[in-house]
Curated annotation (Swiss-Prot):
The keyword Transport does not apply. The lineage of its organism: Bacteria, Pseudomonadati, Pseudomonadota, Gammaproteobacteria, Vibrionales. Binds together with bS18 to 16S ribosomal RNA. Keywords: Ribonucleoprotein, Ribosomal protein, RNA-binding, rRNA-binding. This is Small ribosomal subunit protein bS6.
Length: 122
């Protein structure tokens, strides 16, 4: 089995359905004997440029270990799902399990905001 990094962007109006989509996609990977090494839901983010007149999208990152057949199935599922605006499936040399830069930045921002809130309370 090979390692892949998968990023897909979901229409912002469909953000409530992202959890179900993640469950469906991870389920198809694990049923075929694959493994999920990293799964990050980055939430709604501003796009660098408009896609279909949209300026925001819901981002999801997955690092998986799977067979080519499963990756082809995912690619087809992304293509026929109207809620998925864009997707990227990239093969990697090894499993990546550490948090991404995007997640680290969000955690640092949350910590900074908590510290600021604590300082304001005192």
């Amino acid at each position: 089995m090979r390692h892949y990094e998968i990023v897909f962007m979901v229409h912002p109006d469909q953000s409530e359905q992202v959890a179900g989509m993640i469950e469906r996609y991870t389920g198809s990977i694990t049923e075929a004997g694959g493994k999920i090494h990293r799964l990050e839901d980055w939430g709604r983010r501003q796009l660098a440029y408009p896609i279909n007149k949209l300026h925001k999208a819901h981002y999801v990152l997955m690092n998986v270990e799977a067979d080519q057949a499963v990756v082809d199935e995912l690619e087809t599922a992304f293509r026929f799902n109207d809620a998925v605006l864009r997707n990227m499936i990239m093969r990697t040399k090894a499993a990546i399990t550490e948090p991404s830069i995007m997640l680290k930045a969000r955690e640092e921002r949350v910590k900074r905001d908590e510290m600021k809130f604590d300082a304001d309370v005192e």
